[in-house]
Amino acid sequence: MMESRHAQRKNEHLSLAAKYYDQVHQHHYFDQVRLIHDSLPEMTTDDVDLHVQLADNLEIECPFYIEAMTGGSDQALKINRQLAQLAHKHHLAMATGSLSIISKDPQSFSSFEIIREENPDGIIFANLSANASLDQAINAISLLKANALELHINAAQELIMPEGDRDFNWLDNIQYLVSELEVPVIVKEVGFGMSKTTIAKLQTHDVHLINVSGRGGTNFAAIENRRNHDINFESLLDWGQTTPESLLEAHSIRRGKTEIIASGGITSPLDVIKAGVLGARAVGVAGYFLNILQNEGYEALDQTLGEWQVIVKRLLALLGCSSFTVLSRVEYVLGTDLLSYARQRHLR
């Protein structure tokens, strides 16, 4: 059976993400963050607890998780099955790709349903556009028995996408969904980062979980520009804030109950730790894990996930931190570019 136009678009996203992987990872922005070593951590690895409480009713067993990637096609089904199996094995939370497609192509749901089938007791974040209706949100959460809902905000991607949305009046709808849903709502960028202004707007609309998702990983500007054969948006290929810049933006404002999640350009356990030092409560990883799965195979990603869990725990012990949530007390210095950004933005 021929796949729908929406499914074909999902396959294009996967193909182009792989095509541009090496290009977008030429710059490793977390290199601009150096942690200060303390020779006396006074800690054992047994003292370290990797659990993280993101909300009253949302706890994850490990501070990094498998971030939203794909869904809606046969190829996506295969990927999601493997990712869900590994999430189950390693007790990792996992976010789905955007479920918005299922309202237009109901047959595509099987590529998402497989995630819960392979990981019946795990933590799963459903994912929808920020303009989703309450019925769509309730349906997505119910179908997957999701523990949380990610609402992605992706204005830059949509504007470059030839068939993308052009209406970005999202805040009131986000606030409404937060107030009506029984599961925590995470508002997430898609690789363009967030400013303190954006974060403050979300706070005033009752959002308490924010994924700043900065530039440095999967580049949807490049992906959608490649798909757009009418208008060239090449000037926007480096649009937005990097993940470290976005974390500094978040750190500069009074957060209250708001918890920050980081994603975008995370390629090592040390990046996970650095994100925590800069204020992230948890860290999502998508492109790096997908690249291993597609190019090296299931067993290689299985080994990588296990190694990351061991290394993150040992790095916490090295820094004298009994949990991920106390990393913000670790001292650090910034490289020239990131320090200049922080000073010009009055972030430190």
UniProtKB/Swiss-Prot annotation:
Q: Which GO terms describe its molecular function?
A: FMN binding; isopentenyl-diphosphate delta-isomerase activity; magnesium ion binding; NADPH binding; oxidoreductase activity
Q: What is its main location?
A: cytoplasm
Record GO biological process: isoprenoid biosynthetic process
Which domain of life does this protein belong to?
A: Bacteria
Reaction it catalyzes:
isopentenyl diphosphate = dimethylallyl diphosphate
Q: What is its EC number?
A: 5.3.3.2
Concerning Pfam families, the annotation shows: FMN_dh
The entry marks the following residues as binding Mg(2+), namely E158
Quote the record's binding site residues for substrate.
R9, K10, Q157
What NCBIfam families does the database record attribute to this sequence?
IPP_isom_2
| HAMAP family (alphabetical) | Idi_2 (MF_00354)
Put simply, this protein is called Isopentenyl-diphosphate delta-isomerase
Record lineage: Bacteria, Bacillati, Bacillota, Bacilli, Lactobacillales
